[in-house]
């Protein structure tokens, strides 16, 4: 299997499977002199970690990261400083239950990659989906934690804005509420917590699942990142988000809503601000024009389908060509969109970090220069 690497200068390779001994990533191209701590990497992984509420898989993985290479320790004994060589990180799997998957070793689960992996490779790891499992994304989150350090002043945040037929009230948006102990959904709307709780409890008790829409916002991104035609910043952000398990759609800025309004409504007008710098009067473009960042917040949303692993019996076939009925066992998320929030943040951070380095290398100018 090829294509386990993404990025051009900030290159991330992930490895490992759902029920293997471990998984991890190698980040090649991280500039020297980036200061970070293991705790900063761990904090991002903890946001994605399973088993933290009844609304996510009960697989108990501590996801403790080990940083193996690419750094020297500062005098404080905790701060790591990148040397410019590959940064390798490892996360052990400790709570696999491969026996839960014995019955589907030769059966194809509807909605999963079982059939397509078998068609392409002639072999598949049926234990939790192997490489196609969202377990792999823990490695991306680790890489994304490092990517956040590459672009000075950049802040990448994500939020769950809808779950199934339930949506947040954007008038209540509060970034500080995300991460609150009373908020298991990454919602920025405190009023949505009881709504999501009742809704997802009903879905979960019925043995079913539901999808979600996630919004990622990157502030502090300098203007000038990206390139026309085949190296657009929004193109690479969309590609990264589409690579996440269960993602079926991506939009930047107004996205599909832009097709429903007029040019007067959609085009972001400009003025010169009091400081002599350009100011946009709106951000329908999501911070990107012509594939190049404007300096505004970059806004992307992605749609996550309902988890295919449900308790309801489903019609399928097996490897021998027989009609079968499949009922999934094991531990699964009733809404995989919840834990997709930190994954989406990581993919956006990696894409922007990559374009930051590409811009710096290509133009020879300071970031955002208008010379």
Curated annotation (Swiss-Prot):
Question: Glycoprotein among the record's keywords?
Answer: no
Needs which cofactor? FMNH2
Q: What is this protein called?
A: Chorismate synthase
Q: Which residues bind FMN?
A: 131-133, 245-246, 290, 305-309, 331
UniProt cross-references to HAMAP family, sorted A to Z: Chorismate_synth (MF_00300)
Q: What is the protein's species of origin?
A: Mesorhizobium japonicum (strain LMG 29417 / CECT 9101 / MAFF 303099)
> Its function?
This reaction introduces a second double bond into the aromatic ring system.
Which gene underlies this protein?
A: aroC
Keywords of the record, alphabetical order, are:
Amino-acid biosynthesis, Aromatic amino acid biosynthesis, FAD, Flavoprotein, FMN, Lyase, NADP
The family classification in the record reads: Belongs to the chorismate synthase family.
Q: How does it assemble?
A: Homotetramer.
Q: Does the keyword Membrane apply?
A: no
Top-rank taxon of the source lineage equals Bacteria
Q: Which residues bind NADP(+)?
A: 48, 54
Q: How is the cofactor bound?
A: Reduced FMN (FMNH(2)).
Reactions that this protein is recorded to catalyse: 5-O-(1-carboxyvinyl)-3-phosphoshikimate = chorismate + phosphate
Q: GO terms for molecular function, please?
A: chorismate synthase activity; FMN binding
- Record's GO cellular component terms: cytosol
């Amino acid at each position: 299997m090829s294509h386990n690497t993404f990025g051009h200068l900030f290159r991330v390779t992930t490895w490992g499977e759902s029920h293997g001994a471990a998984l991890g990533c190698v980040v090649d191209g991280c500039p020297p002199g980036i200061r970070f701590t293991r705790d900063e990497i761990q904090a991002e992984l903890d946001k994605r970690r399973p088993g933290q509420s009844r609304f996510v898989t009960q697989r108990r993985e501590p996801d403790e990261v080990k940083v193996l290479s690419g750094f020297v320790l500062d005098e404080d004994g905790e701060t790591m400083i990148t040397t410019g060589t590959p940064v390798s990180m490892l996360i052990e799997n400790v709570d696999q239950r491969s026996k839960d998957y014995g019955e589907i070793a030769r059966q194809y689960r509807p909605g999963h990659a079982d059939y397509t992996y078998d068609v392409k490779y002639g072999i598949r790891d049926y234990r939790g989906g192997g490489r196609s499992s969202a377990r792999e994304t823990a490695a991306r989150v680790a890489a994304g934690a490092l990517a956040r350090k590459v672009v000075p002043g950049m802040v990448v945040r994500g939020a769950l804005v809808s779950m199934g037929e339930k949506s947040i009230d954007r008038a209540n948006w509060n970034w500080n509420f995300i991460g609150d102990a009373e908020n298991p959904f990454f919602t920025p709307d405190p009023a949505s917590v009881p709504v999501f709780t009742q809704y997802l409890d009903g879905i979960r008790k019925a043995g079913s699942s539901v999808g979600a829409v996630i919004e990622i916002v990157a502030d502090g991104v300098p203007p000038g990142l990206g390139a026309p035609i085949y190296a657009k910043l929004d193109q690479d952000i969309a590609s990264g988000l589409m690579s996440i398990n269960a993602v079926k759609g991506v939009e930047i800025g107004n996205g599909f809503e832009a097709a429903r309004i007029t040019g007067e409504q959609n085009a972001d007008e400009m003025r010169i601000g009091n400081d002599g710098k350009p100011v946009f009067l709106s951000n329908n473009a999501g911070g990107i024009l012509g594939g190049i960042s404007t300096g505004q917040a970059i806004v992307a949303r992605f749609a996550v389908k309902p988890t295919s692993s449900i308790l309801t019996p489903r019609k399928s076939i097996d490897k021998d060509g027989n009609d079968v009925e499949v009922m999934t066992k094991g531990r699964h998320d009733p809404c995989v969109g919840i834990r997709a929030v930190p994954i989406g943040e990581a993919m956006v951070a990696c894409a922007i970090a990559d374009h930051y380095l590409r811009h710096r290398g290509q133009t020879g100018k300071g970031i955002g220069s208008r010379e």
